[in-house]
């Protein structure tokens, strides 16, 4: 099991790298994360929903993503509440206190999935969540040492040296663990190192003397990796292209990986705009998905986006709304059942003649079809609770298995769709950008970029695999 001294220490990439290395050797390996908290999720082949990180790790292992790889997914809908997804299906919305009391039941689901994977695969690589040093969350823990103790698996502790304070992070984390948990920790990985390794070696020696545990590997800082991120939204990008794409970043943005292909496009200047930041001029504005459509719609209006969108359209710009962003573009968003919070109805931005009603049932499906405005194929996935209907649906965005999907305005300046991942299909991405005004022969293949990054990760982590196999109690 890989645990980290902090969030974003490198747990996900380390598990992905080890999955790829073992898969290359012919080992039947599978990733597993007991509990994940993220708004960036993926739809599985078995019709469920898991964290984006486990979908990436599945690709690294040469597998189709499956709900057993991430049995508990928490999707925050507010600062104190989240939608609880078990074995790929939404069960209920809970506040933090209620979920803490629910954890023994959640642990049963975790162990069921883990045991199924154990019977099917030679090796199960487990990723922890956050840090095991959160002493306030120790009781009923199912994500870190609580799980490791329950299934009796060894733990590697990874720390990010690029942030600074790496030795304090490791020593401090060990100090917060129980004696049995410290014994379970077999060694450390120092991640994202850049510089002269000889200058680090005295510190490594000191760490091993202080803890009695080995530093298993020092992994380099790898620039330019193209991998799916779960939570951190990258707000900055070097300005390269002349075609300006602007995306607002509301508090509950979801599935921001929709924009990864645009970030990699050499002719696009992608700008993600957070609260309080000036809204720049754009050729294309994209409203992203949201875990709280009405709340994020209120945020957009309060931050001046309604006026910015109207001005953008007056000057001939184009707008795309994805999932929650599509719902916001319509006339109204109704939540009669309180799916996302207090029941009620909100006026939309009024840029598409559709009305949305949020429903308790969630649609989860991988889909494919063609663009309604260009003769090219498209594929992606749907994750949403709600339906949208109205006159604008007569001019759809896509045809999915022959059925109309999404909507376009009468003047063809505004497009809305429930389809996530729509830019990941190279030809569909080019067609959408052409619709928005960019005539380019460039094709960005996100799958190819991701594969190259996984290969780089695996090559960098090979010394770690050798070190693990040299441990006395290591077993594949």
From Swiss-Prot:
Question: What species is this protein from?
Answer: Janthinobacterium sp. (strain Marseille) (Minibacterium massiliensis)
Q: Which InterPro entries match?
A: Class_I_gatase-like (IPR029062), CobQ/CobB/MinD/ParA_Nub-bd_dom (IPR002586), CobQ_GATase1 (IPR033949), CobQ_N (IPR047045), CobQ_synth (IPR004459), GATase_3 (IPR011698), P-loop_NTPase (IPR027417)
| General function of this protein | Catalyzes amidations at positions B, D, E, and G on adenosylcobyrinic A,C-diamide. NH(2) groups are provided by glutamine, and one molecule of ATP is hydrogenolyzed for each amidation.
- Quick one: a GO biological-process term for this protein? cobalamin biosynthetic process
UniProt domain GATase cobBQ-type: residue ranges? 242-428
User: Where along the chain is the active site annotated?
Assistant: 323 (nucleophile), 420
- Tree of life domain: Bacteria
Pathway listed = Cofactor biosynthesis; adenosylcobalamin biosynthesis
Q: Which family does it belong to?
A: Belongs to the CobB/CobQ family. CobQ subfamily.
UniProt-recorded name of the protein: Cobyric acid synthase
User: GO: which molecular function terms?
Assistant: ABC-type vitamin B12 transporter activity; catalytic activity
Give UniProt keywords alphabetically: Cobalamin biosynthesis, Glutamine amidotransferase
């Amino acid at each position: 099991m890989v645990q980290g001294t902090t969030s974003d220490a490198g747990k996900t990439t380390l598990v992905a790298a080890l999955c790829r290395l073992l898969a290359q050797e012919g080992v039947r390996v599978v990733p597993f994360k007991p509990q994940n908290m993220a708004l960036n999720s993926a739809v599985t082949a078995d019709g469920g929903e898991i964290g984006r990180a486990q979908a990436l790790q599945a690709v690294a292992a040469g597998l189709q993503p499956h709900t057993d790889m991430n049995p508990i997914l928490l999707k925050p809908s507010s600062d104190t509440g989240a939608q609880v997804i078990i074995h790929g299906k939404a069960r209920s919305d809970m506040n933090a206190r209620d979920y803490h009391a629910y954890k023994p039941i959640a642990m049963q689901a975790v162990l069921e999935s883990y045991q199924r994977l154990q019977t099917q695969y030679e090796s199960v690589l487990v990723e922890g969540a956050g840090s095991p040093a959160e002493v306030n969350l120790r009781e009923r823990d199912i994500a870190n040492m609580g799980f490791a103790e329950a299934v009796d698996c060894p733990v590697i502790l990874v720390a990010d040296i690029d942030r600074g304070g790496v030795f304090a992070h490791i020593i401090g984390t060990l100090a917060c663990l129980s004696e049995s948990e410290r014994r379970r920790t077999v060694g450390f990985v120092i991640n994202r190192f850049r510089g002269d390794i000889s200058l680090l070696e005295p510190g490594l020696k000191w760490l091993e003397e202080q803890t009695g545990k080995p530093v298993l590997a020092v992994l380099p800082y790898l620039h330019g990796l193209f991998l799916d991120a779960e939570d951190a939204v990258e707000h900055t990008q070097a300005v390269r292209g002349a075609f300006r794409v602007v995306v607002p970043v509301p508090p509950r943005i979801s599935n921001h990986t929709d924009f990864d292909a645009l970030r990699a496009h050499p002719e696009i200047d992608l700008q993600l705009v957070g609260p309080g930041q000036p809204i720049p001029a754009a050729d294309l504005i994209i409203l992203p998905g949201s875990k709280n459509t009405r709340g994020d719609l209120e945020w957009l209006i309060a931050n001046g986006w309604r006026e910015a969108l109207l001005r953008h359209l007056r000057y001939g710009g184009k707008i795309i709304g994805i999932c929650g962003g599509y719902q916001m573009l319509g006339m109204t968003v109704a939540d009669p059942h309180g799916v996302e919070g207090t029941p009620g109805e909100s006026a939309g931005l009024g840029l598409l003649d559709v009305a949305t009603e949020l429903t308790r049932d969630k649609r989860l499906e991988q889909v494919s079809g063609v663009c309604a405005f260009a003769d090219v194929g498209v594929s992606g996935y749907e994750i949403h609770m709600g339906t949208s209907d109205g006159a604008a649906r007569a001019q759809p965005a896509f045809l999915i298995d022959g059925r109309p999907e999404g909507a376009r305005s009468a003047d063809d300046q505004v497009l809305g769709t429930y389809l996530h991942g729509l830019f990941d299909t190279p030809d569909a991405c080019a067609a959408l950008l052409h619709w928005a005004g960019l005539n380019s022969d460039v094709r960005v293949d996100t799958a190819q970029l991701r594969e190259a990054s996984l290969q780089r990760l695996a090559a960098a982590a090979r010394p770690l695999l050798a070190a693990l196999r040299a441990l006395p109690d290591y077993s594949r």
